[in-house]
């Protein structure tokens, strides 16, 4: 494992963007969400650039970014999202994944977006090994690195390893 770092892609007001606009009219909510997305994209871009420079200083080059997508419905209207607490949570996650996608493209990186439910099959195909062996290796990657090393970090490592094989 070369670098493990969170991307700081929000300011305090926009940490949960759809929650922040939950009780606004659709027009005002749309405007605020656009602003929050611009902030998240700029912050993600700055973080990607900083991490890329850090790795460049160690003789490595960043070529791609992997994004694990949720299984949530993508084509839901804003009024429907704001009327459902579950959809608000899904939209919050999609908001930051979309910001990361745009930021990575702005940095001229290849972007691989894959639904979480297809990640293991994708990894098995890319790495040409039994998935049990792959998952065993991923589980060991975080040993001695300190917390967190939970399911999200393991999935991110699995996608990163898969991208290295391409």
Model-derived segments and spans:
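Phosphate- and other anionic-substrate recognition elements at nucleic-acid/protein interfaces
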Residues: 1-166
